[in-house]
Structures are given as C-alpha cells and as structure tokens.
C-alpha cells in the first residue's frame, strides 16, 4: 500500500477503498471514485471522495503496475488457502478474509517502518506530499500534479507546494536561455 500512496499521491482513505475493478494493470491506471472511513462504532463506511475533482483517473508508473500485479497474485494465493476467490469487487488492500484494513493500523505500520529506517516525524500523509514535490521538481505541469492529487483547483496545489517553485523559476530561466541557444559566456562576450 505504501508504494501506491507514494507513486500515485492518493490519500489513505482513497487507497483503502480501491477495488480490483478500479485498477487496470495493462493500461496502467487507477480510478478513484470512493473513500473508506472507520466510524466510532468500529464499522466501515464508503463515501464519495473529498471533492468532485477527487474523483479521478491516475496513471500508474510501470513499477507500481508490476508491484500491484504481484500483490494481486499473492492475494489470490492467500484466498485460495481459505477456499475463496478474489473478485473484481474485492478491496486491493484488505485483511486475509477480504474485510477492510483498519486505517489506524496502516498509519501505525508506516510509523514503525519510518522508525526502522531511522527517520523521525515522517507522517503517512507525507508520502502524498513527496509525490507532489517530486512531480513539480521534475517539471510536471502544476495542473497535471493537481489532477493526480485530486485537488479541487490548481491554486491549492500551487499554494501548498509553493516552497518547490523558487527553484523551478530559476530552472525555467536557465532553460529559456538554453532554448535560445545562449550561454552565460555568450552574454558576457556580447556585453564585454
């Protein structure tokens, strides 16, 4: 699940609600159309995503497609031991019997993993922030990054990740010079 959060920028509640029919491992995309929440009485409820723009299709990198295929095969083997089959309506991330994972158990597993790796203060939601930051640093258009995250507008993405933008401004300025075929030495030579 952690790979999915990091490589797609999904929210925890969105990933927990994914069914196998929501993913296409051949065309490599995930359809986000619901979220999973645990109520105070310990029951689960599926809800509409946070905003209309949160209902979205997110392209999968090839690596994640392979990881999810392996996860699906593992899940099928585990279910075979229980004499049950995995269906398209089954949750991708589930207990052995197919029931939903507890949201707080995912967060606790993340904390243990982070601690074992020697990091402190890295929250599960930071996987989403890392995804967005890396997308923007790689020069991915802010609109595309916003769509992947399911933000209601690109303004939210730009406001949230403005710390990434100063370096991008400098890179864009250098890129403009390079696009015109000019170097710093050319400018010095022509003005000197």
PLM region spans:
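Conserved hydrophobic/aromatic pocket- or pore-lining residues that grip, position, or stack substrates
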Residues: 4, 15, 32, 60, ...
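Short functional hotspots where side chains directly engage DNA or cofactors
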Residues: 27-33, 123, 134, 146-164, ...
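C-terminal secondary-structure termini that scaffold catalytic or DNA-interacting sites
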Residues: 27-28, 36-64, 70, 74-77, ...
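Generic leucine side-chain signal with a strong bias for well-ordered alpha-helical environments
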Residues: 5, 10, 16-18, 64, ...
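Short, charged phosphate-coordinating catalytic segments
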Residues: 5-36, 143
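Short, basic (Lys/Arg/His-rich) helix/loop patches that form interaction surfaces
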Residues: 8, 58, 74-84, 88-147, ...
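Residues that flank catalytic or metal-binding motifs in active/ligand-binding sites
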Residues: 19, 54-56, 89
């Amino acid at each position: 699940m952690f790979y999915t959060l990091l490589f797609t920028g999904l929210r925890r509640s969105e990933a927990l609600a994914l069914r196998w029919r929501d993913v296409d491992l051949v065309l490599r995309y995930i359809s986000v159309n619901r979220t999973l929440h645990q109520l105070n009485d310990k029951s689960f409820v599926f809800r509409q995503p946070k905003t209309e723009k949160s209902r979205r299709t997110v392209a999968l990198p090839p690596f994640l497609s392979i990881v999810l295929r392996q996860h699906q095969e593992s899940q099928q083997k585990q279910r075979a031991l229980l004499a049950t089959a995995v269906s398209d309506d089954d949750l991708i991330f589930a207990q052995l019997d197919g029931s939903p994972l507890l949201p707080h158990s995912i967060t606790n597993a993340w904390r243990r993993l982070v601690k074992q790796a020697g990091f402190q203060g890295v929250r599960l939601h930071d996987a989403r922030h890392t995804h967005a930051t890396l997308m923007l640093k790689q020069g991915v258009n802010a609109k595309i990054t916003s769509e992947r995250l399911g933000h209601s507008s690109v303004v939210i993405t730009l406001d949230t990740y403005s710390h990434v933008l100063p370096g991008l401004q400098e890179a864009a300025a250098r890129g403009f010079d390079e696009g015109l075929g000019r170097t710093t030495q050319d400018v010095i030579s022509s003005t000197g």
